UniProtKB/Swiss-Prot annotation:
Recorded name of the encoding gene: alaS
EC class: ligase
Keyword tRNA-binding appears in the UniProt entry: yes
EC number assigned by the record: 6.1.1.7
One Gene Ontology biological process: negative regulation of DNA-templated transcription
Protein name per Swiss-Prot or TrEMBL: Alanine--tRNA ligase
Length: 874
């Protein structure tokens, strides 16, 4: 049974049991800023389990794409060297949100494994938590698993409820026992059952984990039963496929074998068991799907992790003899394997290919040099009998050649060596400002709140008169009262304040009554439907239960709305001008501008920018109304609404039709396109490989920008004594005049240098048959110095010469040596002798070299020492 069929049977089975098939969420979690990547099926349902994200279904099933390659869950080091470690994997899961519990969860799992997948019952073992008699009895008495194949696992991690069979979401909150299902590969494979000393062997392999969210744990460790008990299960598709296909390594399943063969093809390797092929086959999945979900190789956060994975794959290709880009060629093979299950992969095939190719080309420019340095260093360590690579060198590879530490460690491990990581960390700390560490995600949500959700009125109103204070926070802790001068967070039952979301900044404004005034500086979500007003109490005292008038800064909101609505129009225009591959990859909309990141592989031309501006301004002139509708997500997408990167959507979504644009959006917008006024792009540039950024302004900001631009044009025209319409022609004339004058100046400098050269030749001192000259040439540039040295070499026949010039506090140096003397006196060494004394360095050929310096005061002494330096070598 192929992996694709296994996935399909899983989803269809649970659909037949009343579960809703929910699409895989993005690898970039939309609801947990503390998590680098989605690493399990339950991540997208976290808020559902917590009760803050209601869904129209109580049973769900998913095939969730997942990555474990950064932060706490990091399998990168083991990938390619073990049978079951991957950076990317698919987690099959079924979920119950206060619906069925242990009985049905266990029965469903057993039926699927033994009836649908037809696994032999006598090959299946199960574990339960030591105290979970209920699960034990279901397995033994209802399912009929022999008691000798049911193993109780206690607290085996050093604390109460710290067990392989007890799951927790954190130190507090939902938790409960779990039961795991294992497959026995038989006595021919070494290993013992779970809980035994030999459990780490490969005979008994965990294939499914059923978690029962049964309790809530408080800060004191007390357990109370949850009013709604839930189920979260997870089964790795790759592990299950290995069992069903009767192989002992995930890399032997059909999906991986096809990718390994493709990797062998592009690397021209015939041995399909080579571990490097496994690494490459694994990494193309992680890299491709991360790019699909909007992650781009970079130097921090998720982009840094992606870059590490890409470069690790490239390094393994390099190890196999590939000296040029190859990795991106596997995208088509991956699409053939997984494009049907994940249409978004097929749609993004060209973009993924382009991003990977660009990253490869960039890395191959430096990998050979970096690898040669690393190999030489390792050889030196081995020659001395050592086993540890210097951490300073590892940092140099990281900082100069783009080698992540784990890549260097990977190479070391293959040689039986390690890296001095403390020394690496010390070097990193000294350069912390330039090399910011990856993976430090700051949570913007963290206030404990268990009350009712906030009712938002901001789509229709800019003020609400009877808003009641339901919670107050100071320094992250809940309080009952806030005093004047204190910074605080206020939660209201009703508010017109928009909380930062979807790229749009939160509102500012005032909360007030007759005795109290609270200035709101920002508005952020405390939970999905709970809005926090961040600011300072300027007057009076504020208590839970107080009633206030909540009023936003209407002018700021209006400017923000103009920019947000313009963003929708610009997105559509970009797709018309540049192509349908353009997708939003990030945005920031505030009162001053809109900043929009999108997928595109080349800088926009001036003509393309003008066309986008023209399209948007035409839509503004049409003054089309904005129409908002709420509908099911699937219906909205089928109707042509565009879903945006990084956003988390519920099953009911808000669709905005604005002019020719239709997008899913929960933000605030203008009533008609004409309200935007004027649209102008002011910045276009690149932020990462395959990602461009534009910044644009609207309304009064755009008018002011055009007026200032017009004023500068008039000033420039006046300075050149021309009309504004003649400015381009006049600038061209001035440039021609400058070019002509520079040519004349160059000729004069050459003439001056020639005459000075004749005088300098007379200053040369003969040393052992070689004329030595070290002098300063006033007013010369590097070109003039070089020409003068050449003339002096011709004139003196046998010579070692250093000429210097000083301009703007900087020293320029040129050294020249005739062929007969260059065997003993090298121009590069000679120029460095002088350069080191004037605060610089340089290099070049044995007969000609150049350098610079920043300490001209030391130049006379440095030149005076040239004769003695040459004399020592002759």
């Amino acid at each position: 049974m192929k992996a694709a069929e296994i996935r399909e049977k899983f989803l269809k089975f649970f659909e037949s049991k009343g579960h809703t098939i929910v699409r895989s969420s993005s690898l970039v979690p939309g609801n947990d800023p503390t998590l680098m990547f989605t690493n399990s099926g339950m991540v997208q349902f976290k808020d559902v389990f917590l009760g803050t994200d209601p869904r129209p279904y109580s049973r769900a099933t998913t095939a969730q794409r997942s990555v474990r390659a950064g932060g706490k869950h990091n399998d990168l080091e083991n990938v390619g060297y073990t049978a079951r470690h991957h950076t990317f994997f698919e987690m099959l899961g079924n979920f119950s949100f206060g619906d069925y519990f242990k009985h049905d969860a266990i029965k469903f799992a057993w039926e699927l494994l033994t009836t649908v997948y037809q696994l032999p019952k006598d090959k299946l073992w199960v574990t339960v938590y030591q105290e979970d008699d209920e699960a034990y009895d279901i397995w033994a008495k209802e399912v009929g698993v022999p008691t000798e194949r049911i193993i109780r696992i206690g607290d085996n991690k050093g604390a109460r409820y710290a067990s392989d069979n007890f799951w927790t979401m954190g130190d507090t909150g939902p938790c409960g026992p779990c039961t795991e299902i294992f497959y026995d590969h038989g006595p021919d494979v070494w290993g013992g059952p779970p809980g035994s000393p030999e459990e780490d062997g490969d005979r008994y392999i965990e294939i499914w984990n059923l978690v029962f969210m049964q309790f809530n744990r408080d800060a004191q460790g007390n357990m109370t039963r949850l009013p709604k008990q839930s189920v979260d299960t997870g089964m790795g598709l790759e592990r299950l496929a290995a069992v069903l296909q009767h192989v002992h390594s995930n890399y032997e399943i059909d999906l991986f074998q096809n990718l390994i063969k493709a990797a062998a093809r592009v690397t021209e390797i015939s041995d399909l068991t080579n571990n490097s092929l496994k690494v490459i086959a694994d990494h193309i999945r992680a890299c491709s799907f991360l790019i699909v979900d909007g992650v781009i190789p970079g130097n921090e956060g998720r982009g840094y992790v992606l870059r590490r994975i890409v470069r690790r794959a490239i390094r393994h290709g390099y190890k196999l003899g590939r000296k040029g880009a190859f990795f991106h060629k596997l995208v088509a093979d991956l699409v053939a394997e997984m494009g049907t299950a994940y249409p978004e992969l097929k749609e993004a095939e060209q973009r993924v290919t382009d991003v990977l190719r660009q990253e490869e080309e960039r890395f191959f420019e430096t990998i050979e040099h970096g690898m040669s340095i690393l190999e030489a260093a390792l050889a030196e360590v081995e020659a001395k009998g050592g086993k540890v690579l210097d951490g300073e060198l590892a940092f140099k590879l990281h900082d100069t050649y783009g080698f992540p530490l784990d890549l260097t460690a990977d190479v070391c491990r293959e040689r039986g060596m390690t890296v001095d990581e403390p020394a690496f960390d010390d070097a990193m700390a000294r350069q912390r400002e330039q090399a910011r560490a990856a993976g430090k995600f700051k949570a913007t949500q963290g206030l404990e709140y268990s009350g009712a959700k906030t009712t938002f009125h901001g789509y229709e109103e800019i003020a609400f008169d009877d808003a009641k204070v339901v919670a107050l926070y100071v320094d992250g802790s809940a309080v009952n009262e806030v005093k004047a001068g204190q910074d605080a967070v206020v939660v209201l039952d009703h508010t017109p304040f928009y909380a930062e979301s979807g790229g749009q900044v939160g509102d500012q404004g005032v909360l007030a009554n007759a005795a109290t005034r609270f200035a709101v500086a920002d508005t952020l979500k405390v939970q999905a439907d709970v809005i926090g007003h961040h600011g300072t109490l300027e007057q009076g005292t504020l208590k839970v239960g107080d009633v206030l008038r909540a009023e936003i800064d209407a002018q700021r909101r209006a400017r923000t709305q103009r920019n947000h609505s313009a963003t929708h129009l610009m997105h559509k225009a970009l797709r018309e001008v540049l192509g349908a591959h353009v997708q939003q990859k990030g945005s920031l909309v505030d009162a001053d501008k809109t900043r929009f990141d999108f997928a595109h592989n080349a800088p926009m031309t001036d003509d393309e920018i003008r066309r986008v501006e023209q399209i948007v301004n035409n839509e503004i002139l049409a003054n089309a109304p904005g129409i908002v509708r709420v509908m099911p997500y699937d219906e909205a997408v089928k109707g042509g609404a565009m879903a945006l990167f990084g956003e988390k959507y519920g099953d009911e979504v808000r669709v905005l039709d604005l002019g020719f644009s239709r997008e899913l959006c929960g933000g605030t917008h203008v009533h008609r396109t004409g309200d935007i006024g004027l649209f102008k792009i002011v910045v276009e540039g690149g932020v990462a490989a395959g990602i461009r950024r534009v910044e644009a302004i609207t309304g009064d900001n755009a008018v002011r920008y055009v007026q200032e631009l017009d004023a500068r044009v008039n000033e420039a025209a006046a300075a050149l004594k021309a009309q504004p319409s003649e400015l381009t022609q006049r600038i061209a004339q001035v440039q021609e005049q400058v070019k002509s004058l520079e040519k004349e100046l160059g000729a004069l400098k050459s003439k001056l240098a020639s005459s000075q050269g004749d005088e300098l030749a007379q200053q040369a001192v003969e040393v052992a048959g070689v004329y030595v000259l070290a002098a300063t040439l006033d007013g010369a540039d590097a070109k003039t110095l070089r020409e003068t040295v050449d003339k002096l070499k011709d004139k003196l026949k046998s010579a070692a010469i250093v000429l210097a010039a000083v301009e703007g506090g900087k020293v320029s140096l040129i050294a020249g040596v005739t062929p007969d003397a260059s065997k003993k006196v090298k121009a590069g060494e000679l120029v460095n002798f002088v350069a080191q004394q004037v605060g610089g360095k340089g290099g070049g050929r044995p007969d000609m070299a150049q350098a610079g310096g920043t300490e001209p005061a030391n130049l006379p002494g440095a030149l005076a020492g040239v004769k003695g330096w040459v004399e020592e070598r002759l």
